[in-house]
């Protein structure tokens, strides 16, 4: 189901819809895959490190409600494009993301750069701003000077909001990352699928709670379903209750 490349990236060799069963199979099969990479195929520490980074990035996305894996990559609904870009920056892993109609295809074997992800985030967020500002008389100013001033301000705000890698503490230690992933993959194989899935979710939630999600815990939880800790103030952000309390 998952195959490895010499560069240390992960590929899918079959086509499946995303499901609890697929998530459990891939998560519980990862320790054996890593063992084979090290003992049978002789992957070095750097290759093992890249494999673990790729797995850390892709596993939460396999828990999305809709999508599929195929030989071309991981296919998800297009509206998750922005969140996947943010997650890639947080995770320090930047596979190419191709837009195909109503879906995006995450090409795990085609790495890009953090700079490319930041550029795409700026493009997407700026396009969204322009669309929302359409029809507003003062959306971009009444003259060229105001337009330039507002555009520069927008770009500066967007650049400051783009996440940096949040995995420095966890990713900086190769052995700690490998051990953490292997521990999270442990599950009782003699219990029903739902119990295995729930156990894995909790295991990986503890792992991802170690990461600096930079205020994006709520969107990460919505994207993946992982029960990571979300500060109460983030839950209230933009809500009716928050507006009432602020008045």
Curated annotation (Swiss-Prot):
<feature type="domain" description="F-box-like">
    <location>
        <begin position="76"/>
        <end position="95"/>
    </location>
</feature>
<keyword id="KW-0941">Suppressor of RNA silencing</keyword>
<dbReference type="GO" id="GO:0016032">
    <property type="term" value="P:viral process"/>
</dbReference>
<comment type="similarity">
    <text>Belongs to the polerovirus P0 protein family.</text>
</comment>
<keyword id="KW-1090">Inhibition of host innate immune response by virus</keyword>
<comment type="function">
    <text>Suppressor of RNA-mediated gene silencing, also known as post-transcriptional gene silencing (PTGS), a mechanism of plant viral defense that limits the accumulation of viral RNAs. The P0 protein suppresses local PTGS using its F-box-like domain to mediate destabilization and degradation of the AGO1 protein, although not via an interaction with host SKP1A. Participates, together with the proteins P1 and P7, in the inhibition of the induction of aphid-induced host phytohormones. This could play a role in the attraction to the infected plants by aphids.</text>
</comment>
<dbReference type="GO" id="GO:0052170">
    <property type="term" value="P:symbiont-mediated suppression of host innate immune response"/>
</dbReference>
<dbReference type="InterPro" id="IPR006755">
    <property type="entry name" value="Virus_P0"/>
</dbReference>
<protein>
    <recommendedName>
        <fullName>Suppressor of silencing P0</fullName>
    </recommendedName>
</protein>
<dbReference type="Pfam" id="PF04662">
    <property type="entry name" value="Luteo_PO"/>
</dbReference>
<keyword id="KW-0945">Host-virus interaction</keyword>
<keyword id="KW-0899">Viral immunoevasion</keyword>
């Amino acid at each position: 189901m998952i195959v490895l490349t010499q560069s240390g990236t992960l590929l899918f060799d079959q086509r499946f819809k995303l499901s609890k069963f697929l998530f459990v199979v891939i998560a519980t099969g990862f320790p054996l895959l890593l063992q084979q990479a090290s003992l049978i195929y002789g992957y070095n520490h750097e290759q093992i490190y890249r494999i673990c980074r790729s797995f850390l990035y892709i596993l939460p996305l396999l828990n999305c409600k809709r999508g599929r894996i195929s030989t071309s990559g991981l296919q998800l609904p297009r509206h998750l494009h922005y969140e996947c870009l943010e997650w890639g920056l947080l995770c320090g892993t930047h596979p190419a993301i191709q837009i195909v109609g109503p879906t995006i295809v995450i090409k795990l074997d085609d790495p890009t750069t953090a700079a490319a992800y930041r550029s795409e985030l700026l493009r997407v967020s700026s396009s969204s701003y322009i669309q929302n500002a359409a029809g507003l008389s003062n959306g971009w100013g009444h003259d060229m000077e105001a337009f330039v001033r507002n555009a520069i301000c927008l770009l500066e705000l967007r650049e400051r909001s783009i996440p940096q890698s949040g995995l420095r503490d966890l990713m900086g230690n190769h052995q700690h990352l490998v051990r953490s992933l292997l521990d999270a993959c442990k599950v009782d194989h003699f219990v029903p699928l739902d119990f295995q899935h729930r156990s894995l979710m909790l295991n990986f939630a503890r792992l991802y709670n170690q990461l600096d999600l930079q205020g994006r815990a709520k969107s990460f939880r919505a994207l993946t379903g992982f029960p990571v800790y979300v500060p109460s103030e983030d839950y209230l952000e933009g809500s009716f209750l928050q507006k009432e309390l602020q008045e």
